[in-house]
Amino acid sequence: MVKRLQGVLPIVHTPFTDGGEIDVVTLKHEIDWAYAQGADGLGTGMVSELLRLTYSERIALTHHIAEMSAGRGAVFAGVGAESTKQALIYAQAAEKAGCDAVMAVPPLTTGLPDDQLVDYFRALADGISLPVIVQDASGYVGKAIPLRVYVQLLERYGEEKIVFKPEASPIGPNLSALRDATGGRARIFEGSGGILLVDSYRRGIAGTMPGMELLDGIVALWRALQRGNDEAIYRVYYPICAIVALQLQAGLDGFLAIEKDLLVKRGIFPSDRRRKPYAWDLDAETAAEVDRLFARLQEALK
């Protein structure tokens, strides 16, 4: 039976060997660690470096995360691509692998008119039996998806088939606009890395999709939000915000560099190797500030 998406659903970071291949042993360690921290599931997305993987690597990664999760939580696969045909191939592979949902950004190299956006997501929804997470990643790549496209998809397929991860700025007001335009029916997830999680939670999200590097903090924050414990909320939230603020200065590559640096420091990854080319490296002074903030987060979690 397909598991319902909800709660804390981190995005898997792809570890690489010295030879540049997917490090399957480390991937398994990462997934086991995520569930040990209290993740409700996991999936692949932009910070999995999907756009830098080959076709066969993307398919293999999807199969790995489904198999390695072993029923411990909901699993979803990022399937967005530059053509509908490509995206549908990835989506059908995810269903075959045993995933519980797929997540798709629209094509990133061109701004599509509304009817083409609707057709793209409809092809995915009609082509598989799984739920489709409609992702707007325009906070760092691509263009924003108009609210009317979200509403049209929800009206056609319903809230169990189509769910949303809107990341266009300003995220908070956009979440509320989608919530209100759908009468509260839309199931919405946020993916700000934690920096907007408190605001988003208060607007009624169903879950969050952070990176792995701060997962213990995000789980603690989510649980504090569920309890309504403001003291615990802000004690954990502030160091998370400060770390994510450093990631934001360099876009997607800023997130990747700091995320993998922290995964190495945690002993989860043997190296911070990323797929080239990328636009930003972590300098010594930023790394030192990340270390100071990470220590504060760990202290807040005691």
Model-identified regions with their sequence ranges:
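C-terminal alpha-helical cap/extension of soluble enzyme domains
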Residues: L9-H13, Q37-G38, I205, E213-K302
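Secondary-structure boundary/capping signal
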Residues: G73-A74, V132, K161-I162, A186, ...
